[in-house]
Amino acid sequence: MSFQGKKSIPRITSDRLLIKGGKIVNDDQSFHADLYVEDGLIKQIGENLIVPGGIKTIDAHGLMVLPGGVDVHTRLQMPVMGMTPADDFCQGTKAALAGGTTMILDHVFPDAGVSLLAAYEQWRERADSAACCDYSLHVDIPRWHESTKEELEALVRDKGVNSFLVFMAYKDRCQCTDGQIYEIFSLIRDLGAVAQVHAENGDIVEEEQKRLLEQGITGPEGHVLSHPEEVEAEAVYRAVTIAKQANCPLYVTKVMSKGAADMVAQAKRRGVVVFGEPITASLGTDGSHYWSKNWAKAAAFVTSPPINPDPTTADHLTSLLSSGDLQVTGSAHCTFTTAQKAVGKDNFTLIPEGVNGIEERMSVVWEKCVASGKMDENEFVAVTSTNAAKIFNFYPRKGRVAVGSDADLVIWNPRATKVFSAKSHNLNVEYNIFEGVECRGVPTVVISQGRVVLEDGNLLVTPGAGRFIPRKTFPDFVYKRIKARNRLAEIHGVPRGLYDGPVHEVMLPAKPGSGTQARASCSGKISVPPVRNLHQSGFSLSGSQADDHIARRTAQKIMAPPGGRSNITSLS
């Protein structure tokens, strides 16, 4: 079955390329070899390759040849109060390619009154006509009702979607109850998809927002103050608990704090199938900027969960990422102009949430993890590309440099440096949250679908060239353990005889509107309390009695010790 759908954009002819002298880096090995690309695929890898004449040759001596980056979390079309992000599918994917990312996974978020299927079609239509690189889609579940089950089944069966996100925050808008989350996770497990969660305690966040506004705190600092680290960590723990009970794989998006990251790491060490996604912002900057005197700058950092103000957070997250306790990196790229952010100038709860990071992600991870000595080049490939491809089931088409894989490649210079700035970034916003940050490790050539799209600092992109990448269910990387546990977790009752002894009667609470209580035994059966019928009773106040035929003793002798005793305890 084809998931491609309608696509009116003509296919762009790929280049025939020979990449010579580079060091090919995958998640599990590195080696020097030449590489030949044709028809958008990697055709040959080795030495002394026999290739056609007249092809373009790229000299990669002293450089690395990596699989193109995969950004697992973008929101390039997220609707907020009637506004859409400044960086749409065209601008956002252009920035992605500039940073070495050749595929994104964007989140579909339905507007009120729009079904999941209709929202999916809206996203496909927008992305197909604008995306400059390949893309796929997660689908968010902002509301849960009976028809949602059929929609999820259709998205999995017919639309190539295998991941769905639920919210534990945004009360009265899209926050799910624990019971709903358990039901959704159970369904997702049966469908063979990946359950994602935005983890924050929405009830506490709402109360904190009210309290701060009552105290007159209206600026961006109120955002981070109303989202303390503990509400993220608590929600992660709760999500892990629910997922474990449902035996459903869990993917925690936007891991922003030490507490949340530790919860993911501890659960993983206990054997829970859970994945954690720190983003560019949580790895590359901190939340001290919420207190900037410049309101517009402070507002540019507003996202949920917030960037943690603790300056040691990034170091902690990169350590867990390097050790494998966290497995993937996204950007959660969702940018708004200063004018759009200013909708919340008098109330921080109205500031549109979202930060940049799609262009900076690869270099930030290299600087913070590889250049610092925390991880090697292979682990870098794993957390920026391969693990995402495995989790969401498009590996080895993406995420690997191998014969037959898509020719999405990055020629990486580990020694080159780049300073990020709003003056030079490929975004449509006035602020860059990584302003002035210098990173080692930059892409010098980027190849998408076998075409050179970045070379010598020049971007050569084509809007609409990006393809939708469908994904099948039950990815082995995720579900092998889940399937084994399903087989082992069959529950059988204890064989025993029926209990036929007495059952105590209890009062059941009255049903609303009934005004009466019912009496029930512990077995759950409702019984009417016995009432003596005095008209049929043998009791009489005078005359003969019904039990006159029973012999009675005329007297009872009380036995007591000499001198008597204060308490009579026995009669005979």
Curated annotation (Swiss-Prot):
Protein's UniProt keywords contain Phosphoprotein: yes
Entry keyword annotation includes Manganese: no
Gene3D superfamilies (alphabetical): Metal-dependent hydrolases, Urease, subunit C, domain 1
Protein localization: Cytoplasm
Keywords recorded for this protein, A-Z: Cytoplasm, Phosphoprotein
Phosphoserine: residues carrying this PTM: S537, S544
SUPFAM superfamilies: Composite domain of metallo-dependent hydrolases, Metallo-dependent hydrolases
A cellular component annotation (GO) from this entry: cytoplasm
Cross-referenced PANTHER family: DIHYDROPYRIMIDINASE-RELATED PROTEIN 4, HYDRANTOINASE/DIHYDROPYRIMIDINASE FAMILY MEMBER
Subunit-structure text: Homotetramer, and heterotetramer with CRMP1, DPYSL2, DPYSL3 or DPYSL5. Interacts with PLEXA1. Interacts with FLNA.
NCBIfam families: D-hydantoinase (TIGR02033)
Function summary: Necessary for signaling by class 3 semaphorins and subsequent remodeling of the cytoskeleton. Plays a role in axon guidance, neuronal growth cone collapse and cell migration.
Family of this protein: Belongs to the metallo-dependent hydrolases superfamily. Hydantoinase/dihydropyrimidinase family.
Annotated protein name in UniProt: Dihydropyrimidinase-related protein 4
Organism: Mus musculus
